[in-house]
Amino acid sequence: DYIMANPPFNLKDWRTDEKLTKDIRWNGYGLPPVGNANYAWILHMLYHLDQTKGVAGFLLSNGALEDEDTLAIREQLIKNDKVEAIFILPREMFYSTDTSVTLWILNQDKKGGLRNGRQLRNRENEVLFVDLRTWNQNNSTIKTDKSKKTFVVFNEEQIKAICDIYYGWQTYTEIEPYDKPELYHAASID
């Protein structure tokens, strides 16, 4: 099964100090902090994925990658080999905010095999990092009642290139590391 989501970023005071402290969704990961719900969303999605082959793709603010209050949960997600890929997107991808965002892909089964007609290699203990912050050349403008807002839009060629990076990594069979400096890097979690 698949989950796609764009949860509210950095939601504060999403629970009281006592509420949900023993929630089953946090088992094995720890309690997400009261001051930011980003990792509550992540663990909620992970809990609801098919445990054998579920995949989730979702957007979060870039701060979720470095928040000290969630370091232990983030480390456990990596240790449990749930994170498949992280795509850092350009600023101003949304017309309503200029917040920097990251596309996360979680995968319950990174083993090789035939998936959706494609032969995938074993990607266990690897995470693909893709830095698209400089891919901000294509802009679109929207008029609101009071002003104009410009935001970044990927064109078809860029979308194809992003898919090629991700799909290429999933099927990569060369001995050399899957790496293009300043664009993408496949990191071992061993």
PLM region descriptions:
Residues D1-D190:
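A conserved structural/catalytic subdomain of Rossmann-like adenosyl-cofactor enzymes
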